[in-house]
Amino acid sequence: MFMLHEYEEVVMFKQWIFQNRENLKRHFPKVEAFITERGLFDYSTSTFAVGTAHEFILLSVVSFFAVWQGAYQWWFAVLMGHSIHLFINLAQWIIYRKYIPVIVTTLLTLPYCIYAFVKFTDTTSLSPLQMVLWTVIGITLAALSLFSAFFLMSKFYRWEVKRGIFF
């Protein structure tokens, strides 16, 4: 589910950003300035793939650990972090009012996240307060993971440029 969502972003982002940069600048100048300052308009598809690989490895390790140890609250934290991410993508699409390179798979995977949440709440021994706590943990981990992914992406981008293999 996560990778399906990430593939849309990796495959579509570079072309989308190229085609929509002026529109972003016109309608969302602060967002465009933020992206420009960080050089994200220049990132290659392979640079975005590095970020996706980073996220996938972390998600897989936490999920494997959760199942192996029976510590399903960690899986719940990952589910909630990803679900909140999808709701943010949905809000971005509603605000932008045009295709963004995450919306198709957001609409396809969000129902699964809702279904998994309902099933988890039906079978868990976690209290509602504990689920809120694990949701906060999931959001915090997702944010930290995002920062570290962009750090790795910036390193990879510089490596690409230095070697002249930037696409």
Residue ranges and their predicted role:
Residues 114-167:
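Terminal transmembrane helical module of multi-pass membrane proteins
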Residues 32-54:
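Interfacial helix-start motif at the membrane-water boundary
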Residues 3-10, 82-93, 141-155:
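Transmembrane alpha-helical segments that form the membrane-embedded catalytic/substrate-channel core
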Residues 46-65, 85, 108-114:
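Core segments of transmembrane alpha-helices
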Residues 80-89, 100-120:
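Hydrophobic alpha-helical membrane segments
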Residues 67-72, 90-100, 124-125:
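Membrane-interface helix caps and helix-loop-helix hairpins in membrane proteins
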Residues 77-78, 94-108, 128-135:
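Non-cytosolic membrane-interface motifs at loop->transmembrane helix junctions
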Residues 10-40, 155-167:
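Cytosolic, membrane-interface loops and tails of multi-pass inner-membrane proteins
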